[in-house]
Amino acid sequence: MVYAVYSLNKLISVGLVEKRLCITEEKNRKKTQYILKDQMFRFWYAFVPAAASSVEMGRGAVYYEKVVKPQLHNFMGKVFEEMCRYYTLREGIDGNLNCFVTEVGTWWGTETVEDVSGQKKIQSADVDIVGLAPSEKTMVVGECQFKNAKAGRDVLETLVRRSRAIPSKYRVVQYLLFSKDGFTQWYTDEAPGDVAVFSLDDLYKEGVGH
């Protein structure tokens, strides 16, 4: 056990693994995740070891088409989330959001909802982006949609509902929505003033990661 902890700490120290705490609940040890920080390592361990036999037989291209390509979209979804979190932090520090965000993370837990029959039930919930402004006791929350479809009003409604489950002394002052393929017309015509939307093109234009 001691050796495992030592090895994990070494991986963290060299930047391969990240210890991720649930934002606003950092003292809750049960809400701790260890994730591969380097995206190339994530790709390697997700696909390469299982491809060894195919590659050795000269069938690497076939393996890619049959196994890697169908899963690549889901794999890139996590990369997109990291881009959006970085963008949120930078925009917050630059003063382009509704509060001075200096901390960004992810929240996960449970929420209570009603089913179609009116019965209450508890289900798992997460918020992709939570940006805190400690000096103001305010925060922004965001959702990342990496789909081949425009984000509709329901994405915002889900984000608003889930944000209420976050145990925090911070007040939500803005909702951020990120969508690979943009948004439906509703956002142009009817979205509230405390909602900001960003497409993948917006992130590239701003040079995320540089």
Enumerate the language-model features and the residues they cover.
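Short amphipathic alpha-helical interaction segments
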Residues: 1-15
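A cross-kingdom feature that marks ATP-driven nucleic-acid transaction machinery
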Residues: 22-23, 27-210
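A short, conserved structural fragment
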Residues: 12-24
